[in-house]
Amino acid sequence: MALPTLSAHWPSRVRTLEQQLVRQREQEARLRRQWEQHSQYFREQDVRSSKQAQWSSRQSFHRSMSAFQRDRMREEKQRKLEERRERLRTMLQEERDQLEAELRNIHPDRDTLARQLVEKTDALRSAREERRKNLAQELLREHWKQNNSQLRKVESELHKDHIVSQWQVQQQEKKQADERTQEEKQRFENEYERTRQEALERMRKEEENRKWEEKKRAEELLKQMEELKLREQEAERLKQEQETLMSKRWELEKLEDERKMMEESRRKTEFGRFLTRQYRAQLKRRAQQVQEELEADRKILAALLEGELDEQRFHKARRERAVADAAWMKRVIEEQLQLEREREAEFDILYREEAQRVWEKREAEWEKERRARERLMREVLAGRQQQLQERMQENRLAREESLQRREELLQQLEQDRLTLRLEKEQQEGLRTARIQEIDNQVEQRRKEQWEQQQTLEQEEAQEREELRLQEEELRLETDRMIRQGFQERIHSRPRSAWT
C-alpha cells in the first residue's frame, strides 16, 4: 500500500505557484504602465485645454485685432507718406520748370521788351474795362435782386426750405447714425453672445468629460473596493480554515493519545488475563477488546474520511488518493470487526483444551493483525499530519499574499483619492477663473456700452444746442431786419486795376 503523504504533483504545484507569482508581477507592471500612460494623457489634455482656452479668450481676440489694426495703420501711413512724397516730387519738378522758363526770359531784347509792355498795357486796359463792366452788371443785378419783392420772397422760401431740408438731413443722418450704432451694438452683442455660448459649450464639454472621468474612476475605485472586500473575505476564510486545520490537528493528536492509552490498557489486561488462565472468558474479553479497538479505528477513519470529503472542493486532485486509502482502511476494519463478532459467538462452545489451543492460535493472529493495523494507522495518521502541515503552510502563504495585496490596494486607493482631490481643486480653480473672465468681459462690455451711450447723448445734446443756437440767431436776425426795414446798401468805390 502506497503512502498517502507522498504527492506526485508537488513539483507541478511549485511551478504553478511560481507562474502565478510571475503573472501577478506582470499584471502589476502592466497596471503601473497603464496608470502612467493615463496620467500622461490627462496632463497633456490639461495643457491642451488650457492653451485652447487661452487662444480662444477675449484677450487673445483683442490682441489679434489690435495687432491687425496696427499693421493696417502702419500700411496706411506708409501709403500716405509715399503719396506726399510723390506730390512733393511733382511740385518740385513744376517749380524747377518754372524757374528754368523764368531764367530763359530774364534778358529779352529792346524790341521784344517794348512790344511786351504795349501788349501788357493793352491787356491791362481791356481787363480793367471788363472788370468795371462786370462789376457794374453785378451791382445792378444785386440791386435788382434785393429790391425785388418776389425774389426776396423766393429767397426767404428757399432759405426756409434749406433750413427744413437741413433739419431733415440732420434727422436722417441722426437716424442713420442711430441705426449704425444699434447695428454695431447688436453686432457686439451677437459677438459677445457667441463667445459666451462657445465658452459655456466648452465648459459644458469639459464638465461632461470631467464627470465621465470621475464616473470611470469611481467604477475603478468600486472594482478595487470589491477586490479589497474579496481579499478580506479570502483572508477571513483562510483564517477560519487555519483554525479548522489546527482543531483537526489537535483531534489527530488526541486520537493518537487515545490509541496509546488503549494499547497500554490492553497490555495490562493481557497480563492479568494470563495470570487467571481463564481462557474462555479471556477469549471473549479479548474478542470484545479487539472489537473495541477496531471500532475506535473505524471511528477515526470515518472522521478522517468525513474531513477529507469536506475538503474535496478545495483540493480534489490531491485528496482523492488519501480518501481512497481511508475508505479502504475503513472497509478492512469493518470486515475484521464482523469476523471478531463471529469468533466471539464461537467461543461459548469451546472446551478448555481447545480454548487454550484456539487462544494461542488466535492470539498469534490478533498480534499479527494488530501490528498490521498499527502500521497502517501510523501511515494514515502520518499522511494526515503531513497534509495538515502542507495545508497550514499554503494557508499561511495565501494569507501573507492576501495581506500584501490588501496593503497595495489600500495604498492605491489612497493615491487615487489624493489625485482625484487635486484634480477637483484644479478643475474648480479653472472654472472659477473662467467664470471670473466671463464676468470681467460682461463688465467691460457694459462699461463700453455705457460710454458709447454717454457719447451719443452728448453728441445729440450738442447737436440740439447748435440747432437751437442757429434757430435763435435766425430769429434774432429776422427781428432785426424787420425792425430796421429796407436799407439801401452802400457800395464802396471799385478799386483800380493798377492797385
UniProtKB/Swiss-Prot annotation:
Region (Disordered), start-end ranges: 46-78, 169-209
Keywords: Coiled coil, Cytoplasm, Cytoskeleton
Polar residues bias (residue ranges): 50-67
Chain segments carrying region Interaction with keratin proteins: 74-499
One annotated GO biological process: apoptotic process
Region annotated Trichohyalin/plectin homology domain, chain positions: 260-426
This protein's GO CC annotations: centrosome; cytoplasm; keratin filament
InterPro entries attached to this UniProt entry: CFAP53/TCHP, TPH_dom
Function of the protein: May act as a 'capping' or 'branching' protein for keratin filaments in the cell periphery. May regulate K8/K18 filament and desmosome organization mainly at the apical or peripheral regions of simple epithelial cells.
Protein name (record): Trichoplein keratin filament-binding protein
